[in-house]
Amino acid sequence: MEIKLIDKNGRPAKAGLAVSEATFGREFNEALVHQVVVAYQANARTATRAQLTRAEVSHTTKKPWNQKGTGRARAGMSSSTIWRGGGRAFPNTPDENFSHKINRKAYRAGVRSILSELVRQDRLSAVEEFAVDTPKTKQLVEKIKGLGYNEGLLVLVDKFDENLYLSARNLPHVLVLEAQYVDPVSLVRFPQVLATAGAVKKLEEMLA
């Protein structure tokens, strides 16, 4: 099978880029993609919240009022979990573990499913080469518009390009990634994906 290929001048090439059907021609598995995306986001999450237990809140052990005779409900101390300002029965802690386990084969299958759906929706294109001469954001914006793209673009390259990285760093809707660091969340989040021919080959090697 082939995917759309753009030459370095921004024009569609005469022939598309031949790709592996095993990587870019899979059926879309929505349940698996959901599992992969949720697991990736959960594994990137860090526990930053902390709440106080009954022992940790500021309190006194003095009984608020007598056990009997007042007509009010009995109360022991101000740190009770049902009191305003009291401790939490099951507090969140900074060492909370949010990680989700997902098998490597399932993860790769999920990424292949996403890539295949991007091809079907005509959201994934290949380009012969993608680079800028100097680290200038304006130059990159002009290059992206010259290729027919607007905001919301994920660029996959086969090797790190410092000029390209620095040029895209200040663009909130453009992300440049090396193919080896591609993740399911970025693939799903961006409306359009542009990959160099070298990046496509690297994806095929990684996901084979």
UniProtKB/Swiss-Prot annotation:
| Region (Disordered) location | 54-78
Any single GO molecular-function term of the entry would be: structural constituent of ribosome
Segments forming a coiled coil: none
Q: What's a Pfam family this protein contains?
A: Ribosomal_L4
Among its keywords, does the record have tRNA processing? no
Q: Which UniProt keywords are present, listed alphabetically?
A: Ribonucleoprotein, Ribosomal protein, RNA-binding, rRNA-binding
Q: GO terms for biological process?
A: translation
Got a GO cellular component term for this one? Answer: ribosome
Keyword RNA-binding annotated: yes
Q: Which InterPro entries does the record match to this protein?
A: Ribosomal_uL4, Ribosomal_uL4-like, Ribosomal_uL4_dom_sf
Disulphide bridges: none
Instruction: Give a short account of what the protein does.
Output: One of the primary rRNA binding proteins, this protein initially binds near the 5'-end of the 23S rRNA. It is important during the early stages of 50S assembly. It makes multiple contacts with different domains of the 23S rRNA in the assembled 50S subunit and ribosome. Forms part of the polypeptide exit tunnel.
Q: Which family does it belong to?
A: Belongs to the universal ribosomal protein uL4 family.
Q: How does it assemble?
A: Part of the 50S ribosomal subunit.
PANTHER family from the UniProt entry: 50S RIBOSOMAL PROTEIN L4 (PTHR10746), LARGE RIBOSOMAL SUBUNIT PROTEIN UL4M (PTHR10746:SF6)
Q: What is this protein called?
A: Large ribosomal subunit protein uL4
Native source organism of the sequence: Methylobacillus flagellatus (strain ATCC 51484 / DSM 6875 / VKM B-1610 / KT)
Which gene name belongs to this protein?
A: rplD
